[in-house]
A protein has these predicted regions:
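Alpha-helical scaffolds flanking conserved acidic
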Residues: 34-41, 58, 106-112
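Extracytoplasmic and endomembrane cell-envelope/extracellular-matrix remodeling and assembly machinery
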Residues: 1-26, 30-31, 70, 75-78, ...
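A structure-centric signal for secondary-structure junctions around beta-strands
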Residues: 37, 57-58, 148, 222
Length: 271
């Protein structure tokens, strides 16, 4: 009998792959990228869209502020699309393609650059006098030297879970179908939850990009609210009434330019 794995975080990762894996795979396939890259956000964030490193890297794909902005992600007081699984995955695909092309299709070097920045990788290549990752590796930062082998190991573990003795401690929840509604008015999470008859926690879980439990209005085209497909009809029907509920608690939203100071570090890459 296979052992039941209960170590901290594994069930959450397995659940995350079950719930988000298809979305990531679809994006990778659409961008003609290796499907094994779906395990990269497992290594980066444990598939937690709210993950934030001590250096400020944020979201599933752990984008720094400068990299996120270079990939056209919205980052302001109300919205941080680095935390949006769909938007950040599209940005990650664009970024990974750029790194792949930069290193002539060598994924070992491209992934090292994803972790350490192309500046650090190019410096290591010059010092090694080679573009063979395994020769370049000893000139890379310690974390990056371990990063690519760790991803290779992770791919094997999750592609061959029986061989590795990995099984979840409880059955995984089935994937559920999601839909998106574009909102042009300010809608609080509690109002959205009231309209669709779902808990606020579900709204928050499906919409991690909003920083203040509010979908902000005032933008051409509106901002997306992600919800389960079976909740769309009830939500649209009940939304007008829900917007009147405790309307005085809904804050005014403005998108004035923010001043952000970022200190450039050796090896940083803009995108």
């Amino acid at each position: 009998m296979l052992p039941t794995v209960t170590n901290l975080g594994l069930d959450a990762v397995l659940y995350g792959l079950s719930a988000r894996g298809l979305t990531v795979e679809e994006a990778l396939d659409r961008h003609n990228l290796p499907l094994e890259l779906k395990y990269l956000p497992v290594l980066e964030s444990g598939l937690n869209p709210l993950a934030r490193s001590g250096a400020g890297a944020t979201g599933l794909w752990q984008f720094m502020y400068a990299t996120g902005r270079s990939q056209k992600l919205n980052i302001n007081s109300w919205v941080d699309e680095r935390r949006d699984p769909q938007s950040s995955t599209e940005a990650a695909c664009r970024f990974l393609k750029r790194l792949r092309d930069m290193y002539d299709g060598d994924w070992h070097l491209a992934l090292a650059a994803y972790n350490a920045g192309s500046g650090n990788v190019n410096k290591a290549i010059r010092r090694a006098g080679s573009r063979d990752f395994w020769k370049v590796r000893r000139f890379l930062p310690r974390e990056t030297a371990k990063y690519v082998p760790s991803l290779i190991a992770l791919v094997y573990l999750f592609e061959h879970p029986v061989d590795a003795g990995l099984v979840p401690s409880q059955p995984l929840a089935p994937r559920f179908t999601l839909d998106t509604v574009m909102l042009r008015r300010n809608v609080r999470f509690d109002q959205a939850a009231r309209a669709m008859g779902r808990p606020v926690a579900e709204v928050a879980q499906l919409n991690p990009q909003y920083r203040k439990e509010l979908i902000p209005g005032g933008v051409d085209g509106g901002w997306p609210l992600v919800l389960s497909v079976d909740a769309v009809g009830p939500f649209l029907e009940a939304l007008p009434e829900a917007l009147e509920w405790e309307a005085e608690k809904t804050p005014e939203v403005s998108f004035e330019p923010e001043v952000t100071v970022y200190r450039v570090r050796s090896g940083d890459v803009l995108g």
